[in-house]
Amino acid sequence: MIIRSPEPEVKILVDRDPIKTSFEEWARPGHFSRTIAKGPDTTTWIWNLHADAHDFDSHTSDLEEISRKVFSAHFGQLSIIFLWLSGMYFHGARFSNYEAWLSDPTHIGPSAQVVWPIVGQEILNGDVGGGFRGIQITSGFFQMWRASGITNELQLYCTAIGALVFAALMLFAGWFHYHKAAPKLAWFQDVESMLNHHLAGLLGLGSLSWAGHQVHVSLPINQFLNAGVDPKEIPLPHEFILNRDLLAQLYPSFAEGATPFFTLNWSKYAEFLTFRGGLDPVTGGLWLTDIAHHHLAIAILFLIAGHMYRTNWGIGHGLKDILEAHKGPFTGQGHKGLYEILTTSWHAQLSLNLAMLGSLTIVVAHHMYSMPPYPYLATDYGTQLSLFTHHMWIGGFLIVGAAAHAAIFMVRDYDPTTRYNDLLDRVLRHRDAIISHLNWACIFLGFHSFGLYIHNDTMSALGRPQDMFSDTAIQLQPVFAQWIQNTHALAPSATAPGATTSTSLTWGGGDLVAVGGKVALLPIPLGTADFLVHHIHAFTIHVTVLILLKGVLFARSSRLIPDKANLGFRFPCDGPGRGGTCQVSAWDHVFLGLFWMYNSISVVIFHFSWKMQSDVWGSISDQGVLTHITGGNFAQSSITINGWLRDFLWAQASQVIQSYGSSLSAYGLFFLGAHFVWAFSLMFLFSGRGYWQELIESIVWAHNKLKVAPATQPRALSIVQGRAVGVTHYLLGGIATTWAFFLARIIAVG
């Protein structure tokens, strides 16, 4: 008789076939809501349909079902992303001058779109050099493809097809994990396992495989390209992977294989895993060998991090323990209870993630120009400006989204009965002190930062330049910023002896790097003008935070409306008979926060655009004479409001205003059209609901007279709907206007 130990029970973490796949149900508009599914009585129905289609909280209160819907929707989102990527690569393969650009990136502009001559708009196809006519693109894809070692259009086709396959796979996964094998709630809440897999898998193995690709494919191919070898002569990627001798010709240590790794003689690999700092003078980008080294190091860190959390083996950290041990001398229960919040409220979790990702995106914006990662990126001024602007906008939206979901969490998921004296409770209990102090800071910053400009405008108008705040009169030098710049510029000889150059040329010290007579990067001087505009940045950011934080901290209750939580996330007013309680919902704070986010980002991208054109971007002659695009006028012009209007907005708008009849004319039309979209938003923001209801009723009367009245009764937009439409057009109109202004300018002069 054989005695066996009892088999360990495996936890079943999925439900099989929980929900049947029904096209009939999907075809019924509003199938997720009993009220909406009845069909339209009034035109408000279509608005409610859109507002609630993805508000899974309103479909059901079952957390497991909500989690499954979100999980499934994420696969749908990934599918769309793969489809978009595939389109980008397909355009590169089918409609672009990528191969020509690769052979001469300094004189040929990147283009991946050719306009068909339907009604004479082939004027939009400008000459980008090399005999190619098309629209100049500023997405940075060409530079990224070169960095990853793509040398011909066939490779782009293959990648595009691969992305389509992945898009289909994701679409299937979204259906499968909702209808066939849907994870149980416990699976979504198993944070340690999730951390291990995401850290070690996505970030660790992801970085490791990218480092491997760079070492075995990108580095050798880029070395050939930098040496001027014709792309058609360069061996194909698989040849480098399969034939070690090929690599050994470029990097002799490859002949030794993995021996130096196992014998800890790692310095052998210093040929292709470097620690140089600074920029490659041939391409004006970071050294690709530095980037490979970086990804290898990151991979090691995340592979270790992915083994830190306690799962089936009883060793490692437990998130709950970490959070509950986190107590300070003044924070009561500290983070106790936070674990429960973050595993039962996806809004709280999402809020945290959006705040982090938004901040990270803005960090990316600042690194893309100061440490340009791809070859020939730094000298493509249109792409530099686009990447900075794009990442700033995205970061701003994500941070506002963080506040939005924090407020939704407060209204829908926060349970005050179980929370006592933990960190969140303590913050809520002294919210008045927080908000009033923050308000004071905003007033101080606003008056002082704007006051400095007003002083300068006044002195300038009175003809008293000696009494202005400027580098040549009363100096307000940003001494702390300059100190940070100097510390970093001196780091290679002092605090980072292993590096040969500082991390970024912008810190100072180093010489400028120019590629093909164009400036890639140089030390950026900071002066009084930067000091002034930086305080405007501080002001706009603090006001944005004030609005958003007030929305979160007063989402459930306030002195004005103690029972706000019962009214929900968005509501127009606290019922009839209570004047002065309109526009106080958490949603309204997000609405107002969006406008200030727009203010903040606009000042940042204007500052960046002008500063770079004035002090960094430009050309260098054979004699070594440096000429900047706007000739260094930032320091003296941007210190007055009038200077911003005259020498930045007006002077630089000439290209977009005069673009008609040229290949940039689309930007002129967008500039006009986006101004209209923006102005259209004011109609929604400045007029009341009753005005439109009256107008509609008189129009309906006319229709009834002619017996053409519709069955669905027309209604004016609700207050919240009107404001939503208003802010959407305001932001889209403003962003598209800025886009047209920036690109027409920089493509014409850059």
UniProtKB/Swiss-Prot annotation:
GO terms of biological process kind: photosynthesis
List of residues binding phylloquinone: 692
Keyword S-adenosyl-L-methionine (UniProt): no
Membrane disposition: Multi-pass membrane protein
InterPro entries linked: PSI_PsaA, PSI_PsaA/B, PSI_PsaA/B_CS, PSI_PsaA/B_sf
Domain of life where this protein originates: Eukaryota
Chain segments annotated as transmembrane: 70-93, 156-179, 195-219, 291-309, 346-369, 385-411, 433-455, 531-549, 589-610, 664-686, 724-744
Residues that hold [4Fe-4S] cluster according to the record: 573, 582
Coiled coil: none
Reaction catalysis annotation: reduced [plastocyanin] + hnu + oxidized [2Fe-2S]-[ferredoxin] = oxidized [plastocyanin] + reduced [2Fe-2S]-[ferredoxin]
Residues where chlorophyll a' binds: 675
EC nos: 1.97.1.12
Cofactor binding annotation: P700 is a chlorophyll a/chlorophyll a' dimer, A0 is one or more chlorophyll a, A1 is one or both phylloquinones and FX is a shared 4Fe-4S iron-sulfur center.
Localization annotation: Plastid, Chloroplast thylakoid membrane
A GO CC annotation given for this chain: chloroplast thylakoid membrane
Pfam families, alphabetized: PsaA_PsaB
Keywords from the UniProt entry: 4Fe-4S, Chlorophyll, Chloroplast, Chromophore, Electron transport, Iron, Iron-sulfur, Magnesium, Membrane, Metal-binding, Oxidoreductase, Photosynthesis, Photosystem I, Plastid, Thylakoid, Transmembrane, Transmembrane helix, Transport
Protein function: PsaA and PsaB bind P700, the primary electron donor of photosystem I (PSI), as well as the electron acceptors A0, A1 and FX. PSI is a plastocyanin-ferredoxin oxidoreductase, converting photonic excitation into a charge separation, which transfers an electron from the donor P700 chlorophyll pair to the spectroscopically characterized acceptors A0, A1, FX, FA and FB in turn. Oxidized P700 is reduced on the lumenal side of the thylakoid membrane by plastocyanin.
Cited NCBIfam families: psaA
Subunit and partners: The PsaA/B heterodimer binds the P700 chlorophyll special pair and subsequent electron acceptors. PSI consists of a core antenna complex that captures photons, and an electron transfer chain that converts photonic excitation into a charge separation. The eukaryotic PSI reaction center is composed of at least 11 subunits.
The protein's name: Photosystem I P700 chlorophyll a apoprotein A1
Protein's organism: Vitis vinifera
